[in-house]
Every structure is written in C-alpha cells, then in structure tokens.
Regions:
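Structured soluble/peripheral alpha/beta segments that form catalytic or ligand/cofactor-binding pockets
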Residues: 1-178
Length: 178
C-alpha cells in the first residue's frame, strides 16, 4: 500500500476552488516511525499523539507545485476519545490484494473532531493567510494501485448534528463496483 504515496489538498473560498493539489511521490520519499507515531512524505508530516483521553492528529504541509503555487501551514485535529465507539481494526485490511479483493479502501480516521489551523497559499497575485477553527473530520485512502487508477468518480459528504456526524462515501470503480 505504500507503493503509491500521494497527498491531495483542496481549498475552497465561498464554494470556489482556490487551490488543488494531488502530489504523487516516489515510494522512497515515504518514511514512518512508531514512537512517537509520525509519517513523512516529501516535506509534509503527519503526527499522532494521545494526551489526556484526547487523540490529536497534526498535519504539517509544505507543498510546491509546478505552477509555482506554494502551500505551507499546520492543521490540528483533536478528538475526545471518551465519546468514540470501537470499530474494526483498519490494519486488518492491509493484506495482499489477492486476499482482500480490493484495490482501494477509505479510512475515516476522525469522523468528528475539533480542528484548528493556519495555512499560507502563495503563488497568485496575492498571498492568502487562512486561519480557521471549527468542527471537521479527517480521512485517509489506501490502496494497491495509484488512487486515480481505482475509480471513475466518487462522491462524499458529511452532515454534523448536535451529537452525531453522518459521513458518506460512494466510489464508482472502473470495474463497475460501488
């Protein structure tokens, strides 16, 4: 699953796309460690910490596109683990594709978490500083082929209620499976 590492980022302002990247990396640009848990992909870092029954994920972005756009910044997700229900172990899916019969899987790591961050988008006529604080979610995709080879299209979304979040994800694969 680590043969096709990539990072995708989309930034919208009032329903208009301001920035989109889908950066693929050579497998040797992906490194990880268990204690403390972190993954590095190129100049981007993903860290996980558990502090006082709170699960924190922090993403540190440092991206440069061929178009000269640059995105830098930090995003932190914080989840109160006392409100989390148990789910199946996602790592059990990461077997040989022949055994699991899938080429792509979606891992909804934090379906509902507090999020805060600061991003700097440079490359247009202006530099955008984007600060945010609110409610969001965080997911990962994993597969045994480049993600773009797995699907024709996909649809996803979320609805936050007072105590719950509804998240859906539908992928129309190239072999006709939904």
């Amino acid at each position: 699953a680590s043969s096709f590492p990539a990072i995708s980022v989309s930034i919208y302002n009032t329903q208009k796309a301001e920035y989109y990247s889908f950066l693929e990396y050579a497998p040797d640009r992906l490194t990880s460690q268990n204690e403390p848990f972190s993954i590095s992909l190129g100049s981007n870092i993903f860290e996980r910490r558990v502090l006082d029954e709170k699960l924190e994920y922090e993403i540190i972005l440092n991206q440069m596109l061929d178009s000269s756009y640059q995105l830098t910044g930090r995003i932190k997700f914080v989840l109160d683990t006392t409100k989390v229900q148990e789910s199946a172990d996602f790592s059990s899916l990461l077997k040989e594709p022949v055994q699991t019969k899938f080429s792509h899987a979606w891992n909804l790591i934090q379906p509902r978490a507090g999020v805060m961050g600061n991003l700097v988008l440079d490359g247009r006529s202006d530099i955008y500083n984007i600060a945010f604080n609110g409610l969001d979610y965080h997911d990962h995709n994993v597969g045994f082929e480049p993600l773009k080879d797995s699907f024709v299209d996909w649809y996803w979304g979320r609805v936050h209620f007072t105590d719950y979040t509804l998240v859906y994800y539908v992928m129309n694969t190239k072999d006709g499976v939904k």
